[in-house]
From Swiss-Prot:
Protein origin, superkingdom: Bacteria
GO MF annotations in UniProt: manganese ion transmembrane transporter activity
Keyword Cell cycle: no
UniProt membrane topology term: Multi-pass membrane protein
Primary gene name: mntP
Similarity comment: Belongs to the MntP (TC 9.B.29) family.
Full protein name: Putative manganese efflux pump MntP
Bilayer-crossing regions: 12-32, 39-59, 63-83, 99-119, 132-152, 164-184
Subcellular location: Cell membrane
UniProt keyword terms in alphabetical order: Cell membrane, Ion transport, Manganese, Membrane, Transmembrane, Transmembrane helix, Transport
Function: Probably functions as a manganese efflux pump.
Length: 184
C-alpha cells in the first residue's frame, strides 16, 4: 500500500514537472489568436501525446539504451527553436496568421515537440518497471490541465501586450527550445 502511494506521489511530481513544459509552450501558443474551442482541443491533443509518448518510451525502454532519450530531447528543443523563430519573424513581418498554426499537422508538430521529453522519461520508467497505466494517465492529465492553463493565461497576456504578443510567444518558445538543447 505504502509502496503504491509512494509511486503515485513520485509519478505525480514527475507528471507535474513534464506538464510544466506543456504549460510553457501553451503560454507561448496562447498568444496566437485562438478560440476557446481550439484551446480545449489543443489541451486534449497534448494530453494524449503525453500519454502515448511515455507509453512508447516505456515499451522501448527495455530494448534500447539511454542515448535515444537524449536524442529525443534535442529534437524537441530544435523543433521549439524553429517554431519560436517562426513566430517572431511572423510578428516582425506583421503577418496575421502564423506559418505553423496549432491545427492539423501544426498541432501534431507542437504536441510532438513538447511531449518528446516524456518519451525520454518513459524510457527510464520502462527500465525501472513503473506501473504503466498509472504513469500514462497521470502524465496525460497533468499535461492537459497545465496546457489549458498556459493557453488561457497566454490569451490573457495577448490582450495586454497587443501586437507584440506573437513576438513574446515566439521568445517563450525559443527560450524553452534553448533550455532543452543546453540544459544547465
Amino acid at each position: 500500500m505504502y509502496e503504491l502511494a509512494g509511486e503515485l506521489l513520485t509519478l505525480s511530481i514527475m507528471a507535474f514537472a513534464l506538464g510544466m513544459d506543456a504549460f510553457s509552450v501553451g503560454l507561448g501558443m496562447g498568444m496566437i489568436q485562438l478560440r476557446f474551442r481550439q484551446i480545449i482541443y489543443i489541451g486534449l491533443v497534448i494530453g494524449i501525446f503525453h500519454m502515448f509518448m511515455p507509453l512508447f518510451g516505456m515499451l522501448t525502454g527495455q530494448l534500447l539504451s539511454g542515448w535515444l532519450g537524449l536524442l529525443a530531447t534535442y529534437i524537441g528543443g530544435a523543433l521549439l527553436l524553429v517554431l519560436g523563430l517562426q513566430m517572431i519573424i511572423a510578428s516582425i513581418r506583421k503577418e496575421d496568421k502564423p506559418f505553423i498554426a496549432p491545427v492539423g499537422a501544426g498541432l501534431v508538430l507542437f504536441a510532438t515537440s513538447v511531449s518528446l521529453d516524456s518519451f525520454s522519461v518513459g524510457l527510464s520508467l520502462g527500465i525501472y518497471g513503473s506501473h504503466v497505466w498509472m504513469t500514462i494517465l497521470l502524465f496525460g492529465f497533468f499535461s492537459m490541465i497545465l496546457t489549458w492553463l498556459g493557453l488561457l493565461l497566454g490569451k490573457q497576456v495577448r490582450s495586454w501586450v497587443g501586437s507584440y504578443s506573437g513576438a513574446l510567444g515566439g521568445i517563450i518558445l525559443l527560450a524553452f527550445g534553448i533550455k532543452l538543447l543546453f540544459p544547465l
